């Protein structure tokens, strides 16, 4: 049930009846303060200006045409022409009942789309580090939300599995007579990579051999392809352990690395030349874009093939977008890549549009994010100044959560404690990131993320168990409760019910904008409203059974909404804490 969409349509029709144009925007929003009702229509200002009348006068005319019978108990004009809408308690009660009767909590399904989501994208032959965390968990929250809404989601893990580094690695493995790469662990590969790079930079003979191996690999030589596959396999096996620990839905089947697009690149360059978009410039093949200017104010040249015949990331990204539209039949493509790549992506997509590879009707969206910073406001590093490995970060999260949980539950059995520590520790790391607006940098702080107060995973997980504890004490007859009516008389009951029914609106925003922090803010607010409701509206000691059952049903929908909301974020809930 999307109340905002329902009210928007009702207000829009009333505005048209009052003389507004058919494309008028009612701007119905959730009210910021209870005295302004549950919703507020703010669109009268802009429309009244076009019609040459006072906003309040337009609002008065709109009210004469606005039929919210059975939806609102009161509608009033405030200030210069805002329309405040107070939802009818009977309407709230009816829709709480409907939400409880539905596995989807009354959430409707929009028109189904095929949506490709590009996220995580670690490099082969390197361990995942904290720089991969944001893309991986923000992208996964978007995927979970879109799938819940009923879309066909194609996860695309665009791993770095191609390029000159593979010539180096294979040459170094061979030099060390360790061709049997399958028995190596990734930590070894990282060491190999460093050694190979050192030799590549210092030993011209070795560098030449590495370059030859790249050519052989790219030409499809079976021995080199097999060595390359081993390197990819070791990496992806290790990464899968990290994905599983993070409770992320990516699998090996979702890998669509750079190598997938490599065979397409010569054809792309030839086609761009044939279309007159790409030209030769100083030996390289370049596309000049009017939308981007260089320092001299001239159209910027984007290289798609180097002098030596090599291709660039831009060429791969052009092929990638083309493939996602033509082969995967995407209706929409989302990229969870950090903000530093924005211009690069915009240039690749400008070429894609000019070439007609992806029509304008298919959005290509860069859902960029900021950096993860330490308490000092600088990029998050180890004490020695190195890159923090993701596995090490998760180990520390688990260890800290273990201590925290053991302190609060000294008698808890070891296996139960481990399970709880895992849910709290991993949940804390993920939620701390997801609860921040992805477009900004955020400070990584263990103390804040593991706190039981504020907008944190431990607080949200505890809030969920607190609601469940009501049911443990209540000794409920499920059938009797299901048949009982919901009755809303108190203000706090109405406020909680209205917020519960805004779950679909929240999901819709997350799906449209790729902003999981909006879901975190909603769930945190919901937990706070339940806390106030629980304090002021006795449940188990209510004045009669009818009120008791009605309040139990509000508690029941709160628990289900918290669980489902946290699930769309990939945060595990627990029964006890």
Curated annotation (Swiss-Prot):
Q: Where in the cell is it found?
A: Cytoplasm
Q: Chief location of this protein?
A: cytoplasm
Spell out the SMART domains in the cross-references.
Arg_tRNA_synt_N, DALR_1
Q: Which CDD domains match?
A: Anticodon_Ia_Arg, ArgRS_core
Entries under InterPro entries matching the protein: aa-tRNA-synth_I_CS, Arg-tRNA-ligase, Arg-tRNA-synth_N, Arg-tRNA-synth_N_sf, ArgRS_core, DALR_anticod-bd, Rossmann-like_a/b/a_fold, tRNAsynth_Ia_anticodon-bd
Q: Per the record, what are the reactions this protein catalyses?
A: tRNA(Arg) + L-arginine + ATP = L-arginyl-tRNA(Arg) + AMP + diphosphate
Q: What is its EC number?
A: 6.1.1.19
Q: Which GO biological process entries does UniProt record here?
A: arginyl-tRNA aminoacylation
Motif 'HIGH' region, residue range(s) on this chain: 122-132
Source species, domain of life: Bacteria
GO MF annotations, alphabetized: arginine-tRNA ligase activity; ATP binding
Q: Does the keyword Cell cycle apply?
A: no
Q: Provide GO CC annotations from the record.
A: cytoplasm
- Keywords for the protein's UniProt record, in alphabetical order: Aminoacyl-tRNA synthetase, ATP-binding, Cytoplasm, Ligase, Nucleotide-binding, Protein biosynthesis
Q: Does the keyword Protein biosynthesis apply?
A: yes
**The protein's enzyme class:** ligase
Q: How does it assemble?
A: Monomer.
Which family does the similarity line name? Answer: Belongs to the class-I aminoacyl-tRNA synthetase family.
Q: Which HAMAP family match?
A: Arg_tRNA_synth (MF_00123)
In Swiss-Prot or TrEMBL terms, this protein is called Arginine--tRNA ligase
Organism listed in the record: Shigella boydii serotype 18 (strain CDC 3083-94 / BS512)
